[in-house]
Each structure stands twice: as C-alpha cells, then as structure tokens.
Amino acid sequence: MDHTDEYIKEISEKIDSKKEYYVEISNKIWEFAEPRFQEYRSSELLQHVLKQAGFSIKADLAGEKTAFIAEYGSGKPVIAFLGEFDALPGLSQKADAAERIPANPGSCGHGCGHQLIGTGTLASAIALKDFVKEHNLQGTIRYYGCPAEENAGGKAFLVRDGYFNDCDLALCWHPEQGRRACYGSTKANFRVFFTFHGTPAHASMCPELGRSALDAVELMDVGVNYMREHMIDEARIHYAITDTGGDAPNVVQSRAQVLYAIRAPKITQVKELYNRVCNIARGAALMTETTVEIRQVAAYSNLISSKILADHMNAYLEKLGPITYTEEEYAYAQKFQQSLSDQDKNQLPTIARDYFGPKAAEVMKKPIFEPMAYQNLYSDLKYSTDVGDVSWLVPTVHLNIPTFAAGTALHSWQAVAQGKSSIAHKGMLYAAKIMALTAIDFLQKPELVNKAREELTKTLNGETYPNPLPKDLKPEIW
C-alpha cells in the first residue's frame, strides 16, 4: 500500500508547525554571520536546538572547534544530514535593502545561504526523528554540523578522520535558481598559499642589495597566466595577493604572499595542475633570488551524485509541486532583480535556458523561478563543495531550491540582503520536507540503501577516495 500522500502530509505538518521557530533560528545565524572555523554562536545554537529535540551531541571534532554530530536512534541505515553555517568575509549587508548598504562594514555576510542550509537540514532531521519514533522504525539519524565550507573545506577533515565511515546515505541542499536534484558533479579544488621571502633594502640608495618578494609574486602570477593556454578548458585558477609586503615603495619587499585556488573536474587533474603551479612558483623564486614556502590549507574533491537518491528527490519535488508566493513576494523579488547589474540582467536568459530549456521564456515572466528544472540535470557545476569528499564514501544527493529572486548571484550582497525574507524561509522549509521524505523511503526499504551503495561502487569503477589533504594538515583560521 502506498502511503506517500500520508507521509507528505505528516512531514509537512511536523515542519510547518514549527515554522516560526525555524525562521528565528535561521535569522539568528544570519545575524551572527561568523567566518570559517569561528562559527561559535551558530554552532552552539544548533547544538542546543538538537539537544532539546532529543539528539545526543559530540562536539569539537577533527580539530574543528565548531564541528559537531547530533545523533538519534540506532542501527542501520545511518542517514547523514549535512548542515553548514559559515558566512563570507566582506559581505555584510542590511537585510531587505535593494541597494548596497553594509550592516557592519568589513564584516561577514551570508552570501551563500548557509544560515538556510544549516537550519533547513536541522528541521529535516528533527522531523525525521519524530517520524521514526512515532512509526517505530529502525535507523540512525545524524546531523553533521559542518564548519568552514567556504574556502577551508571543513568536511574533508571530518572525512579524513573517519566520521563518515559508517554512514549509508548523505543528504544536503543548497539555495539555487531552480528546484531540482542534480546528477552532475562539481569541481575539485586546492587552496594553496605561496609565501616568498626576500631581502629588504632601500629601493633608491642600494636597490642592488634587495631581493623583492613582491616581484616573485608578480612573476608567479604572470607565469600562471601564461600556463592557462596549456591546461584543460574545464580547469579554473584564481588568485588573491594576501600580502604585498607593506605600503612603503622605497623599501624592497622582503615578504609577499599569494593565495591560489586551483580547480578542475577531477581531483587527479587538480593535483597535476598544482604541481605545475608549484614549479612556476619555484621558477619565480629562482628568477628573483628569493625563497618560496608552499602551504596547502584546504582541498575539495569532486562531487559524485547518487542518481537513485536524486530520482527519489525529484519525484517528491513533483509531488509537492511548486512553492507558492504572494504578490508582495513577487514585488520583493522584482525589486532585487532591478538592483542587478546590467551584466547580471543579461545573464538571466542564459540561466533560464540552462535550467528550463524550451520553457525558459515562459518561466522568466515571474521574478522567481518556480517549475521543476529538468534541463541539464547531468551538467557538471562550476563551483566546488566539500560535500564532494563525503560523496566518495557515502551515496550523496545535493538538492537545489530557490530562495531568492531569479538572477541573484551567490556570494553577492543581494543574496545576503534576501537571506531573511519570506522567500528564503519558504525555500528552506520546502527543502527540509523533501529531504525528510526522501530519507523515509530509504529507511523503510533497505534494498534502496543497497542499490545506492552498488551504484556508487559501479560509478567509482575501482577508484578509491584520493584523500586530497596532506596527512599533517590541521584546520586553521587564516
């Protein structure tokens, strides 16, 4: 007998009945806006809520003070919900303001919706816990409090230290332009500091005695830019000069530093590019008679999506139907669409085609993309996520739900500004329902868990997880 409609009603009621509570939690995390590995208040709040809901807590994991696992139940399957809560530096923004108004200039802001991710997965885990208890089901529900997704890859440290070894499924979600569970991958990624050390000297009186670390940084950047012609099209390399050596031009800079992000579709390709970039850095040091210190601080593996999990999620997306919005919410979204740059506005048709194909023109008539986004489900994504590291060990699904005006770029002030809106909260609670309903299918049918594991084994085709972190690397605030 099919109980799908009953379960949809039950899970929806469990989540909707606590709507104001979850909105308050999300808004508090938005206000905390704490950077990577410093999400102390956000982590404490989430732990408190889960403990109150009947979960046991293990905290301070893998050298990450703000990481934790909340657990309920026992036995198999072990279902992991991946929560995030770190904010982005320099993106502070006044809520609901459709113009650039930093709330606290220079501070962090939630430009990637992690306050929604952390709270939405929490709501889903609690609803599933209540369902399991009431229906007397066996299984273990875990909420993973995952810090530092941005720039530091916090999950990779948790994976390396074995915290996912006994998991059977992993569910997560992310704000995006359309409703869908994708089958595609994300880019693998290394984050590496190159610090050059030279010799200071008076730049006019005795420049011949100086050896410029800043020259080395600039030569390295030029060398990498020439390398771009000779790497695969799908690769991306970005850099930020984090230390120019000071602000005195009459002193030869004795220290300078640059941070590189190296991306490619597969971790093996990233390693190859990394070795080439390191050689360019050594060459720059040789040319300038400086020395270079190379320090990798983070790594992200490419995502391996579970089609079986995604199929179940997409079926529930169809069953639940589109999120409904009010005229006031459409007007709110329209206001933010108008705030976009001309370049961003010109990208809207392309975004709509990527998500909705031939339906793009019709979908664009509203300022929030509503239908199922079936176009390009197999397309690989341009960004990186440390969910990828989990996915090499555990069948994993990555759900996308809209939480902002169509065309809003992630990591933008517009994304921060809309983070406390009713549009954002509707998307968050909708995602919570989809994840809980998907988990119920796999709790009740062990054969689905086995199929998901078999699918992952087949996809890997003999490959083993190439843990990209150096063995001695510890999480650090940088």
Where do the language-model regions lie?
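General structural feature for long, well-ordered alpha-helical segments within catalytic domains
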Residues: 7, 18-25, 38-49, 77, ...
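Conserved short loop/turn motifs at secondary-structure junctions
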Residues: 34-35, 144-148, 297-302
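Non-cysteine beta-strand/loop elements that form the S-adenosyl-L-methionine
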Residues: 80-82, 91, 197, 399-402
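Metal-dependent amide/peptide-bond hydrolase catalytic core
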Residues: 218-478
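Divalent metal-coordination and catalytic microenvironments
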Residues: 29, 70, 81, 114, ...
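Acidic/His- and Gly-rich active-site-bordering loop/insert found
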Residues: 2-110, 115, 119-140
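A short small-residue
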Residues: 5-6, 24-28, 99-107, 196-204, ...
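Histidine/acidic-residue-rich, glycine-tolerant segments that coordinate divalent metal ions
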Residues: 66, 88, 97-109, 115-116, ...
